[in-house]
Amino acid sequence: MARLRPRTAPLDRRDRPGLARCVTAGSGALLLVGLTACSGGGGGGGGTAQSAPEAPDSAVISGDDASAASVEMTSALFDSTDAVIVASEEDAPELVDEAGEAGLPMLIGTGPDVVEELDRLSPDTIVTASGTDLGDAAGEREVVEVDPSADSYGDLPSGSAPEDSAEVSVLIDPLNPSPADPAARANAQAAGTSVQEMPNGDPRTNGDSVEAARAVQDQGDLSQGVLAVGSSFGSIDELSSRMETATTVAELPGGGQVAFPGRRMVAAYGSPGTSDLGILGEQDVDGAIERTKELAAEYDPHSDVPVVPAFEIITTVASSEPGPDGNYSNELPPEMIEEWVDAAEEAGVYVVLDLQPGTTDFLTQAQRYEDLLKRPHVGLALDSEWRLEGDQRHMEQVGSVDAAEVNETADWLAQLTRENDLPQKVFVLHQFSTDMLPDRENITADRPELAMLVHADGHGTRDLKMGTWNTLKQDLPEGMGMAWKNFYDEDTPTWTPEETYDIEPRPWFVSYQ
C-alpha cells in the first residue's frame, strides 16, 4: 500500500496555566509550577515545515488494534516531530482534545512497533499520562507527565502542520466507534487534515454523510488521500464504490442513497380515488401529502433517526372478477400513478408501488411500471396475499408466492436500479402467515441495490399482532429487515407511535390502513 510521504510538524512552545511534570528519562521526577518550558533538548519556536508530502493511496485502517492503527496514521502523516503524545488505550480518549489543541501526534501503547515508530519520528519530548510505564519507549527522551483528569495540563510543546501539506481526509464512524478513533482524531488534527464523520462507515447513509463525501471529493482524486478508520468502512474497493455513489447518484427523500439505517419511513397505505382500500385514497394527493407528513412528525420524537413520510400506493388492485385479461387484478394506468409520484417527489415523500397481481406473476406486473420505478424515490411491494394460483380466488384462499418468483422480481429491480444509477430501493414483502412465503429462507435479501423488508400485516388484538410479529421475525434471511402495519378499524386499539417504536426490533417502515 502506497503511503503519504510523511510530514514534519514544526514545534513551538505555548504558555498555558496549570501543571506539568517534566521528567528526564532515567532521572527522578520533578514537579514544576508556572513553568515556562520544560528543560531539555526539545526544538524551540519558530521552526519551519519540511517539503509537503504527496497524498497517500486511500486506505481502510483497522480500528480494532488501537496501537497498530496509531502507528499507521503517524507513519502516513508525519516525517518527524519534536514532541509526541504516548498514551494507553484507556487514557487516549482523555488526551485526544489536548493532543489536537497542541498539534501533537499521538501513539497508543508502548510495544515494539511504537518504539520503532518513535525512533523514526525522533521526538525530543514524550507527553504521557502520570504513572505511565513507558519502558523502552522513553529512551533518552524528555518525558512530560500530565494528569488526564485535570482541566489543563500546563505548558506543553505545541506543533503546527505545514501550510503546503497534502490534502488528506480521515473518516470516522461515529455510530460504531473503534479503539483507534481517539488517536485518529488527534493525528488528523495535528497534521492539519480534516475529519469527516460517516455513520455506519457508509457515505451514502444520509445527507450529512453525502455532504462529507463531497467535501472529500473536492480534494481531487478519491483514490488518494482518504484514510478510513474502522471495519464498518469495508474494503477500500467497497468504500471507493460507495464514495462514487454518494457523490454522483440522486439522493432519497431525507438525503443519502441507502434507505436504512439512516432514516425510518411512515406511510399512508391505499389507492388513489377510493377510501375503501386505505387512508391514502381518503383525500386528494395534496391532502395525502399533508396527512402523511403529520403522521411522520408524530413518530419523530420517538426515533433515533429522521422519519420520512411515504406513500404505499396499491397500483394493481385485487378483483373478484377476472377482468378483460382474466387475471383477477385491475392495473391502474401508470399515468394515473405518475401524478402522485410527481407530487411526492416535490414534497420529499417516498413512494412504494404495491402489487396485488391475482394470477399474473409479480415480475410481469412490475415491468408494467418500469418508467415509474426508474424514479429515485420509488420502491416496490409484493403483496403475496393476493398472488393466486389458477384455480384460487380472492377472499376464498390466501395467496402465496415462492422464493424463486420473489428472487426473479428482485433481480430485475436490482438490475434496473444499477443500470440507471439509482439510489437503493425499498423492496417490501407483505406477510401475515408463514404459508404466504413458504420457502422464505431461500429468498436472497442482501442485494446492495435493494432494502428488503418483511411487512407484518397482522391485525386485531395486541396479543394477535405481537404473535404474528414474533413469528415472522424468526429466521429472517440475511439482509432482511422488518416493517409494521397499523390499522385504524381492525386493530383493537390502534397502536400509538410510541408503542409502535417500542416493538423489538423497531420497524423501519410503518404503514397505516
Report each predicted region and the residues it spans.
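Catalytic domains of carbohydrate-active enzymes, especially glycoside hydrolases
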Residues: 190-194, 250-314, 343
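Bacterial signal peptide processing site
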Residues: 39-42
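C-terminal motif of bacterial Sec signal peptides marking the signal peptidase cleavage site
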Residues: 33-37
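Chitinase-like catalytic core of GlcNAc-active glycosidases
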Residues: 303-349, 359-375, 379-381, 388, ...
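N-terminal export and membrane-targeting signals
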Residues: 2-29
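Structural preference for beta-strand elements that scaffold enzyme active sites
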Residues: 263-267, 306-312, 348-352, 377-381, ...
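Surface-exposed substrate-engagement region within the catalytic domains
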Residues: 171-174, 201, 205-215, 396-512
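Extracellular glycan-binding segments that recognize GlcNAc-based cell-wall polysaccharides
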Residues: 44-255
